Regions:
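P-loop (Walker A) phosphate-binding loop of NTP-binding proteins
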Residues: 8
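Conserved substrate/cofactor phosphate-moiety recognition/catalytic segment
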Residues: 18, 22-61
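A glycine- and Lys/Arg-enriched "phosphate-lid" helix/loop adjacent to the NTP-binding pocket
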Residues: 99-143
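Hydrophobic anchor at the beta1->P-loop junction of P-loop NTPases
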Residues: 5
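Glycine-rich phosphate-binding loop used to anchor ATP phosphates in small-molecule kinases
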Residues: 53-98, 102-106
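NTP-dependent small-molecule kinase module
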Residues: 143-176
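ATP-binding Walker
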Residues: 11
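Walker A/P-loop
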Residues: 14
């Protein structure tokens, strides 16, 4: 099974992937690691700030990794904010039945109430530079992601009152 975890920055994609690794022993790939490897090795002229260009660039690689893992009957978790909302259009039904997708979304209320906690826990798994992160940016991105998930009928986890994700939702029968 392939599990795709998407969401805005700071929603907990990487820590969720780590917890799933520990629970199910599925390896995970952080799209951020792929991005930085390609940038640092000079295999692209894109920078970490070229989000609009990075989505199609990275997705063209990631979707083929997904296909390869499925063809090899391997389990894999892939997490990152560079998964386009129309990702499912790149796979036929034989692939789609082996892919589970979920987007992590924080509500406006959660962000406003817990912004300092979001900053505090930002580096639990990876080191981050938090100087440029604003509450307004997080609210806008999460609202956009919620709208897109609804538009495409994608599964999402809404983080509203407290940050609690039941990882058992990732059992095969619970996600589409």
């Amino acid at each position: 099974m392939i599990i795709l975890i998407s969401g805005s920055t700071h929603t907990g994609k990487t820590i969720l992937a780590q917890k799933l690794l520990e629970r199910y022993n599925y390896p995970y790939l952080s799209i951020d690691h792929l991005k930085m490897g390609l940038i640092r090795s000079n295999n692209t002229t894109l920078t970490p700030y070229d989000d609009d260009e990075l989505v199609p660039y990275l997705w063209n690689i990631v979707k083929e990794i997904v296909k390869t893992a499925i063809e090899n009957n391997q389990n894999l978790i892939i997490e990152g904010c560079y998964i386009p909302f129309d990702w499912h259009n790149d796979f036929d039904n034989d692939y789609l039945k082996r892919i589970k997708y979920c987007c992590l979304i924080m509500t406006k209320k959660y962000i406003e109430t817990h912004f300092q906690d979001i900053l505090k826990y930002a580096s639990v798994i990876e080191e981050r530079d938090e100087e440029k992160l604003s509450m307004e940016y997080l609210i806008t991105e999460n609202q956009k992601n919620l709208s897109m998930c609804k538009k495409y009928g994608h599964t999402y986890i809404l983080i509203d009152k407290d940050y609690s994700i039941d990882i058992d939702i990732f059992k095969r029968e619970n996600l589409k």
